[in-house]
Amino acid sequence: MLGLEKPLSSDISSSSTDTSAISPISVSSMPLSPDKEKKKIKFIRYNPDIPQIVTSFKGYQKLMYQGYRYNIYQVVPEKNFKSWRCVCAKKMPDDGQWCKCRAETTSDNSNACTKNTHNHPPKHRVAEIEFIKSQLINAAFENPDHDAGDLINQACMYLSEGVSFDNKESLKKSLVSARNKEGKPRKPKSKTSTNPLKRMKIEIEEEDENVFKMQRMDNDITGFLPLLNNSISMVKVESPFSTTPTIQIPPPNPPQIHQPQEHSNLLQPAALNGFNNSWMGGIEDPIAMFWANAMLNPSGLDVLSTIAALSKHQLHSQGPTQAATAPAAPLSSNLSVSSFTPQMPKEASMAIPPTQILNLKDLKPLPPLAAIQTSPVIQAASLLRPIPMKNDMGTQTVEEIKVSRCLTSGCGCRVIRICCCDEGRCRRAAAC
C-alpha cells in the first residue's frame, strides 16, 4: 500500500515566486525583450532650401526644391548634368497656362539652380508630404518586420506644425502592398484587343450537364459554326416533297427583237388579231391612216419611221406607190387576244383636215385706245354696272314705318327704299 508523502514546506518569502513579482504592477514595469522592443526609425525633416530627391510608389524620381516639384527630364552622365521639369509643365495650373520653369542639378543631385520663373505659387505642404512618404517607403523595405502603422506614427512626428497625412489607413495599405510586391517581377501589361468578337466569348459551366457542350469561340468567325451545327441537329425536318408532284415552271419567253418595218406599211391598214379591217380601206388621207393605226396598235408606233413615211408619201403622191399594191402587213405580231382593242367609230373614217398656219400679214392691227374707250359697247357696259342694294334692317323709327306703309288700306306690305349712292359718296350732294 502506497502512502502519501507530505510535501516539503518552503518559505514563501524566500521563494523566487514572490506575490509581488507576479502582480500586475510589476508585470507592466518589466522591461520588454529585445525582439519586441519598438525600433526607432529616424526621418529627415523637410527643408525647402535644400534640394531633396524623393522616390514615388511607382519608382519615379522627383526633385523638391523651394516648395516646387520637378520630374526628371534629361540625364547626361558625360557632362555631369541632370535636367528637371516642373510638374505643371503638362498639368494645367489654376491660371490656365503651362509652367515653363526648369531646374538643373549635377549627377549627385546637388548644386540646384532654376531657369525661368514659375507661373504658380509654391506648394510646401504637398512637397513635404511627398518627401516624408518617400522616406516611409525606404523604411518599410529596410524593416520588413516592423509594423506599418507604427512607421506612419513615427513619421508624423517629423512633420511640420499643421501638416498631416490625409488618410493613414490608405497609406498603410500602400506600404503593405509595396512590401508584398518587393522582389516579384511585374506583370506585363496586356494590350487591349480591338476584335469585337473577343467580348462575345461564351463560357459553359461544368456543373450543368443538361446543357450541350460547345467549343469556346475564337477570334475567327468560324467560332459560330459549332453553335449553328448543334442548333440544326436539334431540329427534325420532314420533307413534304415525297408525295407532292413536282411543278415545272416554263422558262420565260425571250424578248423579241423589234424588226424595222417598211415606211409604206405604216400608212396601210393594219390587220388586228389576224382579221383585216375593211372599214380602214376607205381612208385615203395618210395622216388619218397613221392615227388609225396608232390607236389600234400603240406599241408599233415609231416616230422616226412615221416621219420618213409621211415625207416619202408627199413626194410620190402624184404617181402610184408601191404601198398601194402591196398586201397589208400587220404592224405587230406580238399583240395578244387579251390586249385592249378599241373599236374605231365611223366618224374616224372621215379625213382629218390639215392644220392651218396663221400668216402674220393677214392679221389686222388693233384700233387705238381712244377709239376703244369711246365705243358705244364700252359705254353701254358701264351703264349696266350693278348697283348694290341696301335693304331695311329693322332700324327705322315709328314715323319712318308709318311713311313706308303701303297706300292701300288694309295691306300689310311695306315700301322698301333703295339708295343709289356709292359707299362714302352721295350722288345728290355731287349734283348740288
UniProtKB/Swiss-Prot annotation:
Organism this protein belongs to: Caenorhabditis briggsae
Record function comment: Putative transcription factor. Binds to specific sequence motif 5'-[TC][AGT]TGCC[GA][AT]-3' in regulatory elements of target genes such as myosin myo-2. May modulate gene expression, perhaps acting in opposition to transcription factor pha-4. Involved in morphogenesis, perhaps especially in formation of the pharynx. Plays roles in molting, feeding and morphology.
FLYWCH-type zinc finger span: 53-120
Top-level taxonomy: Eukaryota, Metazoa, Ecdysozoa, Nematoda, Chromadorea
GO MF terms, alphabetically ordered: RNA polymerase II cis-regulatory region sequence-specific DNA binding; zinc ion binding
The organism's place on the tree of life at top rank: Eukaryota
Keywords linked to the UniProt accession: Developmental protein, DNA-binding, Metal-binding, Nucleus, Transcription, Transcription regulation, Zinc, Zinc-finger
Gene3D superfamilies per UniProt: 2.20.25.240
InterPro entries per record: Znf_FLYWCH
Keyword Hydrolase included in the entry's annotation: no
Segments of skewed composition (Low complexity): 9-26
Protein name: FLYWCH-type zinc finger-containing protein peb-1
